[in-house]
A protein has these predicted regions:
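Conserved alpha-helical "signature site"
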Residues: 2-255, 262-270, 301-408
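Flexible internal linker/loop segments at domain or repeat junctions
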Residues: 276-305
């Protein structure tokens, strides 16, 4: 395999075990960062042409330190003092409340693991884009506008996304075109160009699946979306830097590898509510009145999400891979995804599989680092685990991979 892609270094058992331990800790830290309300997504490398954050989320604050002013801190301190006083006056009630919170959270986590595991791909996502058709035509030399238009004809949401994109003046300036009020998807595809369509369609196809409007998880949605974009684009960039044929396949690989997160977060609110109702019924049947009435005060507990993501994302991604119909020409892409799901050592992977591993490592590093929570001393081990050359890290960051490079 190309040395531009991997370091080809062999490490002793002690170093390998340490790198694996650090990898598990960092992945866990990233899952907690995703759901934490304390950390917001750094906006400096977000591609607003594809993110829906401005539509559904609160006003964007570019720096985390701007979130809390000194006056707000004083107010929070006063409010905390009052809460503490009330807690002393109602200590027993708080104890019951705490136990109910833990009880519901435990039940909700078990319920989510069970129900999500049993769902079909259509149940998980509500709809599943026609990646089978896309992958069968997108990377062929015979790809043309007519073949691409089949997708916009059969997928109304994709059609609307394509039209919105080519009618966006800022986006059009990136591809050297003038914005027009286009209504014909075929003309819109022509405006984008075949190369840009093969690059962007997987992103536009998956875009409607993530629920940005859920008030419980709307703080998580921008982070999930950026993780998908980074994973997809960095996979493409690494394949490009290694001189692999059809590097744009990296976009689809990244999308398919990360979209399972969308399903988990999309279902969280409803599944938590279902679990809460089930516990209320149990308390009522057991005549536990205090616990029963305490249920009404419980809000969805996001702290269980990291465990659910950790337990299910590989299993659900296998369902995604199985849902796509692969051809003899695209089976290497399927194999790359399976290499990642099976945790095949990077040195034993195909170039696509190695690039996908490195892209995920970069995506996690980048977002944690921008929030100041990546452990710096872990960096050499983190990237050594995916055989990523040190110089590649800066090369990728210099390209601002949160934004998609387009052909003009």
């Amino acid at each position: 395999m190309s040395t531009a892609l991997i370091t080809n270094k062999l490490y002793n058992q002690e170093a390998t075990e340490l790198a694996e331990k650090i990898t598990q800790k960092t992945r866990s830290r990233h899952a907690k960062w995703l759901v934490s309300l304390k950390y917001i997504l750094d906006q400096s490398d977000v591609d607003n042409a594809f993110s829906r954050q401005s539509e559904f989320c609160d006003t964007v604050i570019l720096k985390e330190e701007e979130r809390i002013t000194e006056n707000q801190r004083l107010l929070l301190e006063c409010e905390t003092a009052k809460v503490q006083e009330r807690r002393k006056a109602a200590e027993e009630r708080q104890k019951v409340h705490k136990n109910v919170v833990q009880d519901i959270a435990k039940h909700a986590q078990q319920s989510m693991l069970s129900k999500l595991s049993d769902m079909t791909t259509m149940q998980l996502f509500g709809r599943f884009p026609d990646f089978s058709y896309f992958v069968s035509v997108a990377y062929s030399p015979s790809l043309n506008f007519s073949k691409l238009s089949v997708l916009t004809t059969n997928d109304n949401q994709l059609k609307n996304n394509v039209l919105a994109l080519v009618n966006n003046p800022k986006f059009c300036s990136r591809i050297g075109k003038s914005a027009r009020n286009l209504q014909d998807p075929m003309v819109a595809i022509g405006t984008l160009g075949v190369d840009n369509c093969s690059l962007l369609f997987p992103i536009l196809m998956v875009k409607p699946i993530l629920r940005w409007h859920d008030p419980v998880t709307k703080s998580i949605a921008p982070k999930l979306w950026q993780h998908l974009i980074l994973t997809a684009n960095v996979t493409r960039l690494r394949l490009e830097q290694a001189g692999v044929k059809n590097p744009q396949q990296g976009i689809l690989l990244g999308v398919l590898r990360t979209m399972s997160h969308f399903a988990i977060v999309n279902h969280f609110s409803q599944l938590f509510e279902d679990a809460q109702v089930e516990k209320m019924q149990q308390y009522r049947e057991q005549n536990r009145r205090e616990e029963y009435y305490a249920c009404a005060e419980i809000t969805p507990d996001l702290s269980i999400l990291p465990n659910v993501i950790h337990e299910l994302e590989v299993q659900l991604t296998r369902k995604v891979v199985a849902e796509v119909e692969w051809t003899q020409f695209t089976i290497p892409m399927k194999n790359a995804l399976l290499e990642d799901l099976d945790q095949v050592p990077v040195l034993e992977r195909s170039p696509q599989g190695a690039a996908l591993a490195q892209a995920q490592a970069y995506a996690i590093f980048d977002t944690l680092d921008r929030s100041g929570v990546f452990v710096e001393k872990h960096k050499p081990f983190w990237f050594a685990n995916v055989q990523m050359p040190p110089e590649a890290l800066q090369q990728i960051r210099d390209k601002h991979p949160g934004r998609i490079d387009l052909s003009k």
